[in-house]
């Protein structure tokens, strides 16, 4: 085989991979659009009237996750399953965003932390890498940290809306998250930096709870602060 033939063959490989990446990008763009629609829907809970609409908004968000499943099913067909991490960078950020959105829905519904397995059911993907297109542990953790930031914001807006007990519940939840993350030995630089922001979320919520307690808005809040 001549030198030119070798490079022609290599160009064929490069072109084929570029085609794969282009197909992946198209699906990821659709995922990003659906994620924006879900986020817009859930952002309504930060508004005064949005608190009464939480069940309705969560139900509607779950309907949108049906579209997410369809897009992810399509994405799985665009590349060989064993090459997941070769193309992972294309969908990593939108998948983390979808984890956050799924976690936010579950929290609004039950004030609990969604498990990684439950997220994979919502998204229609696998929990284990051996089974193909899956939810990487670090992507799950990143999504959970985005949730913490969103909840710290919700604690402030809850007070504005006159819901004085919600910040206490959020404070308990975020402190439990912080305790959980302290058990992990995080090696991923991006994840570790994002975790550094969790302490600010914890502090922000604690300040809201403390402010409520000294102003006497909520007996439950005040009692909890006295116990501390």
UniProtKB/Swiss-Prot annotation:
User: Tell me, what's a Pfam family for it?
Assistant: Translin
Positions of post-translational Phosphoserine modification: 190
Stretches the record annotates as Leucine-zipper: 177-198
Residue span of region DNA/RNA binding: 86-90
Per the UniProt entry, the Enzyme Commission number(s) are 3.1.-.-
Give compartment(s): Cytoplasm; Nucleus
* Positions of post-translational N6-acetyllysine modification: 187, 199
Q: Matching Gene3D superfamilies, A to Z?
A: Translin, domain 1, Translin, domain 2
Q: What class of enzyme is it?
A: hydrolase
- Coiled-coil region(s) at which residues? none
GO CC terms in record? cytoplasm; endoplasmic reticulum; endoribonuclease complex; nucleoplasm; nucleus
State any single GO MF term. RNA binding
GO terms for biological process, alphabetical = siRNA processing
The record's listing under InterPro entries reads: Translin, Translin_C, Translin_fam, Translin_N, Translin_sf
Q: Keywords of this protein's UniProt record, alphabetized?
A: Acetylation, Cytoplasm, DNA-binding, Endonuclease, Hydrolase, Nuclease, Nucleus, Phosphoprotein, RNA-binding
Query: What's the subunit arrangement here?
Result: Ring-shaped heterooctamer of six TSN and two TSNAX subunits, DNA/RNA binding occurs inside the ring.
What is the annotated role of this protein in its UniProt record?
DNA-binding protein that specifically recognizes consensus sequences at the breakpoint junctions in chromosomal translocations, mostly involving immunoglobulin (Ig)/T-cell receptor gene segments. Seems to recognize single-stranded DNA ends generated by staggered breaks occurring at recombination hot spots.
The UniProt entry's sequence similarity note says: Belongs to the translin family.
UniProt protein name: Translin
Originating organism = Bos taurus (Bovine)
Q: What is the lineage of its organism?
A: Eukaryota, Metazoa, Chordata, Craniata, Vertebrata
């Amino acid at each position: 085989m001549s030198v030119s033939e070798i490079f022609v063959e290599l160009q064929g490989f490069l072109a084929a991979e570029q085609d794969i990446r282009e197909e992946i990008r198209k699906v990821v763009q659709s995922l990003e659009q659906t994620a924006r629609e879900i986020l817009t829907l859930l952002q309504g809970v930060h508004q005064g009237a949005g608190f009464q609409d939480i069940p309705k908004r969560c139900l509607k968000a779950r309907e949108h996750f049906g579209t997410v499943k369809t897009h992810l099913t399509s994405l799985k067909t665009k590349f060989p399953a064993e090459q997941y991490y070769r193309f992972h960078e294309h969908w990593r950020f939108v998948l983390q965003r979808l984890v956050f959105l799924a976690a936010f829905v579950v929290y609004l519904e039950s004030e609990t932390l969604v498990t990684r397995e439950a997220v994979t059911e919502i998204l229609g993907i696998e929990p284990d890498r051996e089974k193909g297109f899956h939810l990487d542990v670090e992507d799950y953790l990143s999504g959970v940290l985005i949730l913490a930031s969103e909840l710290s914001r919700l604690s402030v807006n809850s007070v504005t809306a006159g819901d004085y007990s919600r910040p206490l519940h959020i404070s308990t939840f975020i402190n439990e998250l912080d305790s959980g993350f302290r058990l992990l030995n995080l090696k991923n630089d991006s994840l570790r930096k994002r975790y550094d922001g969790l302490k600010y979320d914890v502090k922000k919520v604690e300040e809201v709870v403390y402010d409520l307690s000294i102003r006497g808005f909520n007996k439950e809040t005040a009692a909890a602060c006295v116990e501390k």
